[in-house]
Amino acid sequence: MEKKNHEVVQVGFRGQEFDVDKTAFASLKVQTALNLGDKDPRAANEAMNLICCGRVVEYIGRIPGEDGEMPDELGCTSDDWQAFTSAVAEAVAPKN
């Protein structure tokens, strides 16, 4: 199977820039893995890693809280991660 060129865009979130693979985000395979995350969390994590250009662990450590404070050694909170993923979805979703 031929490898497709991926469109990578920068998404701003709480004052920082993150590279996001727009092509991976639009993939049915990736979206299915995300939607089935409660049944297969590993597949959902792998899908997010594809969307985050292989840097999901780095991003978890870089996402600031609502107050702008950087996370500690455990990474961002689940609420901050959810806000980040929502911002990514809004930024890369097809516009009508």
Q: Model-predicted segments: where are they?
A:
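Short, surface-exposed, charged amphipathic helix/loop patches that serve as local interaction elements
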Residues: E2-Q10, R14-Q16, K22-N96
